[in-house]
């Protein structure tokens, strides 16, 4: 945009010449925290607003997902705080059982060559607390760097004494209400870490495997419809056949339905097992016969329950074949329905070695029919890295069906709303098919299960051993041992909204801030965390009428931040970007070290190095926290996948610089000047009236966007107003009044400059807090505001009476006319400073009025020597024409353009574009490129092609115009 200089000499503004986030951010945050601005205001007569943070793992460090969600939360908290609400952002960290235990185990192994067993349970747990004291603050310090206005004095940890009491209380009450029980069921077992793990900790990998077709002989001389004395079963896990207790066929399958109720003689073991009819057997798949191993497969477990088949566990917790099998009935009680003998040659061998041995034996006996290549999904533990074994173990469970019923109703009747709404369906699909929840883990670090056993195996549940002895009249002569297991971390985080506010005590905080207002979370933990919080909260917390209370009124689901090519960010891909590296900047060397150092798979390092050098040849520049936050807000669309975009980050850093420089211009023209704050006549120009009306409309649209959780729209509204309307237009439009206006007009322009800037800073503050506070501290002096911080200033409100339709339409028309002139200059290669004469043809009454009322203004802004209205019958010289609303703008070309030179220039430009178009079309017609390149890359190429074609069309049109001169 062309700039007209402000001619008066002004003093240097109090704002530094360049915006330097590094110098501003941390001192400012420390000041905010020390001043107590993050705390609730304590005014309980005011409406409260509370968000609880999804507690990050105490072992963790800040990643893009955290930065994304926390930016959204802080934007909401700052917005509500500025509306005078009693605001609490409750923070804390999760003890992250398995993750933390592994971090400390690795540490003592590396530093001392010891295992946790060398320490023993108590000493090892002390070691973890010691580690937490030293390293556990990393993530909270990083959260401070993001500008999060969290009440740090209320920070909680899921193993704090208060939260531990809440966990015990919840467990005991659920047990007393028969909603917690101990049972033998199938779980995901990690043979390396020796613990049950949740589905979320299971990573399903696609692998090339085999399908073994095995012959199972029929008992008692029975034959199939085809006269065969055997069935063929197909399996991907032949080692589990030692635990088979049935063979399933589809009851509709004509080949086998007459065999239902007959028996098989299981090879290698000679166990007689029944043939059962079950829908689980698919007639179209494999041979239509499925071996059933209820103790080692989740589907088989369900089939076994339906047909009351015994369960035979053939594996140890290490994943080796047992010396003696464990035989249980369908209820998990020890059974003698089958022998527990296992042939000696398989005893004690590792499960995958057993697979080879068993297949070899089938082959020797002539019972191996064929081996087919087969693509299959294999579950791995995401931390232990080994294949997960479905294992029959004694675990503690929560009966979820009665809890889920209430939790489903809360969403159905609108007490809890999901944003975007489509996530409700995901919630319902989980909740309507809910299984009992396994809450015990075989770890040392975590909330130990509050259950004790006597020597006869009787179980007693209570808040402490003292309570158990007292309630059950157990003398000190009776020995009690506490359950060794700890609770799933999701159990304690399921109580998060109310345990952090003091439950089971009926605290003021609980009364004031519960139910909380909004939960911000990723859709990947909708079941593991969100659903469980709803179930637990509604069970334990009731309102004054005894109605179950929801944990939060709204659930705002964020998408997943992926890299620029749409790939998930992961260490093994080497595409993780640390949010703080974008804030502070990082050299290429340091970035490479970060991405390739300590890799689990060092062979990937070279590929990652090349990719990183290509993407960040000079490392990553400093962008500052505000630019990062603005980018994250702008990317917060309603989609599931959000591709990170470094160009947008650079664009929003430029935005911060633009706002800084605009503020310097405003301060230069207002500091120590008469801005009409103390009376004195004020005349507002059309430009002043327009920007005030424009700002008022912006406030309305911006608030609507924030109120409906459209942070992407809010960011765009803020960007558009600040960059385009305020900086590019209004600052230019204000110069004629400032430089040449009357005293009243100068006062009006100054008043408008400071008024709009101060309002804009308050408007932008929730998204970009640091830069807005820094500038506002200077602006408040000009405006005579006494307050200490922008954080507690009132948020701008839309005022119907400030609507000025006439100013909006008049100035939009003038802008359109000036843009038409500027476009002609650019297209015809006319110097920006060259004064032009403009003719207006077919001007309607509105256009004529606007020119008459604002002639000087239009001439100054368009660098025009004259504006002439042509009568309808008047002939115009050869001109370039643009249509605008209610008129045609003509600029006579005589003496302005060197026709031949201009045509030659345009031909060169067109030739260059043709080459580029050819190259892109070549790429896109290459099937190999289109099928192999990431979707985002192909889309970018298609966009480039469309842009090149548009540019070419424009150049051809210009060429035609010039050729006609």
Swiss-Prot record:
Subcellular location, record wording: Cytoplasm
Disordered: region residues: 1-23
CDD domains: Anticodon_Ia_Val, ValRS_core
Any single GO CC term annotated in Swiss-Prot or TrEMBL for this entry: cytosol
Key words, A-Z: Aminoacyl-tRNA synthetase, ATP-binding, Coiled coil, Cytoplasm, Ligase, Nucleotide-binding, Protein biosynthesis
Biological processes, Gene Ontology terms: valyl-tRNA aminoacylation
Gene3D superfamilies, A to Z: HUPs, Isoleucyl-tRNA Synthetase, Domain 1, Valyl-tRNA synthetase, C-terminal domain, Valyl/Leucyl/Isoleucyl-tRNA synthetase, editing domain
Family: Belongs to the class-I aminoacyl-tRNA synthetase family. ValS type 1 subfamily.
Record's protein name: Valine--tRNA ligase
Organism, scientific name: Photorhabdus laumondii subsp. laumondii (strain DSM 15139 / CIP 105565 / TT01)
Lineage: Bacteria, Pseudomonadati, Pseudomonadota, Gammaproteobacteria, Enterobacterales
Gene: valS
């Amino acid at each position: 945009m062309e700039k007209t200089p402000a001619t008066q000499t002004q003093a240097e503004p109090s704002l530094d010449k360049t915006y330097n986030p590094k110098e501003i951010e941390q001192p400012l945050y420390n000041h905010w925290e020390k001043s107590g601005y993050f705390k609730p205001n304590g005014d309980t007569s005011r409406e409260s607003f509370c968000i609880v943070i999804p507690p990050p793992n105490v072992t963790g460090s800040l990643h893009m997902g955290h930065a994304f969600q926390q930016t959204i939360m802080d934007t909401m908290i700052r917005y509500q705080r500025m509306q005078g609400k009693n605001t609490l952002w409750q923070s804390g960290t999760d003890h992250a059982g398995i993750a933390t235990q592994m971090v400390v185990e690795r540490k003592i192994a590396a530093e001392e060559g010891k295992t946790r067993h060398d320490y023993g349970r108590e000493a090892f747990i002390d070691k973890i607390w010691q580690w937490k004291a030293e390293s556990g603050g990393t993530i909270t310090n990083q959260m401070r760097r993001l500008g999060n206005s969290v009440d740090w004095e209320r920070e909680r940890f899921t193993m704090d004494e208060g939260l531990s009491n809440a966990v015990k209380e919840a467990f005991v009450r659920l047990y007393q209400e028969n909603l917690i029980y101990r049972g033998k069921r199938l779980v995901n077992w990690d043979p390396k870490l020796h613990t049950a793990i949740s589905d979320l900790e299971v990573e399903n990998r696609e692998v090339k495997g085999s399908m073994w077709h095995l012959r199972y002989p029929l008992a008692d001389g029975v034959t199939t419809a085809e006269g065969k004395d055997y069935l063929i079963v197909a399996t991907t896990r032949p080692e589990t056949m030692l635990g088979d207790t049935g063979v399933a066929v589809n009851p509709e399958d004509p080949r086998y339905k007459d065999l239902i109720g007959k028996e098989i003689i299981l090879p290698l073991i000679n166990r007689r097992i029944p043939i059962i009819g079950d829908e689980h057997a698919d007639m179209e798949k494999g041979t239509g016969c499925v071996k059933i191993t209820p103790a080692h497969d989740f589907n088989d477990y369900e089939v076994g329950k339906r047909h009351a088949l015994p369960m035979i566990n053939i594996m140890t917790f290490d994943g080796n074949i047992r010396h003696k099998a464990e035989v249980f009935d369908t209820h998990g009680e020890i059974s003698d329905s089958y022998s527990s003998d296992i042939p000696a040659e398989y005893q004690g061998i590792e499960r995958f070695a057993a697979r080879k041995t068993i297949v070899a034996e089938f082959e020797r006996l002539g019972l191996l029919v064929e081996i087919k290549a087969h693509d299959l999904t294999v579950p791995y533990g995401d931390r232990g890295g080994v294949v997960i074994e479905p294992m029959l173990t004694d675990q503690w469970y929560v009966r979820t069906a009665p809890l889920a019923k209430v939790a489903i109703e809360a969403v159905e009747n609108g007490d809890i709303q999901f944003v975007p709404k489509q996530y409700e369906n995901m919630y319902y699909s989980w909740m309507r098919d809910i299984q009992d929840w396994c809450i015990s883990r075989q770890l040392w670090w975590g909330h130990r299960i509050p259950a004790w056993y006597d020597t006869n195996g009787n179980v007693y549940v209570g808040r402490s051993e003292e309570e158990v002895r007292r309630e059950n009249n157990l003398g000190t002569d009776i020995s009690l041992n506490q359950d060794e297991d700890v609770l799933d971390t999701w159990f304690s985080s399921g109580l998060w909204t109310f345990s952090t506010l003091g439950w089971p005590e009926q605290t003021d905080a609980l009364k004031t801030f519960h139910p909380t207002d909004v939960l911000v979370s990723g859709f990947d933990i909708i079941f593991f965390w969100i659903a469980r919080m709803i179930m637990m909260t509604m069970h334990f917390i009731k309102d004054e009428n005894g109605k179950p209370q929801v944990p939060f009124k709204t659930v705002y689901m964020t998408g997943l931040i992926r890299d620029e090519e749409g790939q998930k960010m992961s260490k093994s891909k080497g595409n993780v970007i640390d949010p703080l590296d974008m804030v502070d900047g990082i050299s290429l060397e340091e970035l490479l070290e970060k991405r390739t150092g300590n890799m689990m798979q060092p062979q990937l390092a070279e590929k990652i190095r090349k990719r990183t050098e290509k993407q960040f040849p000079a490392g990553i520049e400093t962008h500052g926290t505000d630019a990062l936050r603005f980018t994250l807000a702008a990317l917060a669309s309603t989609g599931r996948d959000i591709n990170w975009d470094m160009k947008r980050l650079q664009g929003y850093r430029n935005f911060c610089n633009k706002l800084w420089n605009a503020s310097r211009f405003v301060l230069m023209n207002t500091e120590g000047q008469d801005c009409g704050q103390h009376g004195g006549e004020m005349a507002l120009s059309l430009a002043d009236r327009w920007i005030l009306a424009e700002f008022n409309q912006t406030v309305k649209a911006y608030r609507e966007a924030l109120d409906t959780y459209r942070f992407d729209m809010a960011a765009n509204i803020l960007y558009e107003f600040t960059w385009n309307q305020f900086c590019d237009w209004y600052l230019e439009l204000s110069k004629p009044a400032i430089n040449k206006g009357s005293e009243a007009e100068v006062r009006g322009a100054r008043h408008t400059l400071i008024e709009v800037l101060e309002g804009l800073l308050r408007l932008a503050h929730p998204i970009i807090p640091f830069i807005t506070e820094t500038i506002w501290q200077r602006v408040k002096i000009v405006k005579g505001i006494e307050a200490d911080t922008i954080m507690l200033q009132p948020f701008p409100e839309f005022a119907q009476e400030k609507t000025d339709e006439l100013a909006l339409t008049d100035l939009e028309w003038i802008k359109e006319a000036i843009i038409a002139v500027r476009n002609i200059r650019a297209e015809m290669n006319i110097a920006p400073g060259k004064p032009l004469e403009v003719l207006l043809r077919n001007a309607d009454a509105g256009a004529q009025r606007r020119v008459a009322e604002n002639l000087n203004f239009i001439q100054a802004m368009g660098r025009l020597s004259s504006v002439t209205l042509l009568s309808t019958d008047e002939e115009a010289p050869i001109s370039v024409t643009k249509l605008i609303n209610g008129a045609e703008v003509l600029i006579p070309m005589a003496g302005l353009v060197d026709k031949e030179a201009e045509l030659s220039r345009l031909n060169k430009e067109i030739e260059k574009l043709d080459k580029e178009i050819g190259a892109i079309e070549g790429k896109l017609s290459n099937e190999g490129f289109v099928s192999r390149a990431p979707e985002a890359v192909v889309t970018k190429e298609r966009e480039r092609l469309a842009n090149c074609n548009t540019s070419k069309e424009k150049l051809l049109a210009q060429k035609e115009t010039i050729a006609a001169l």
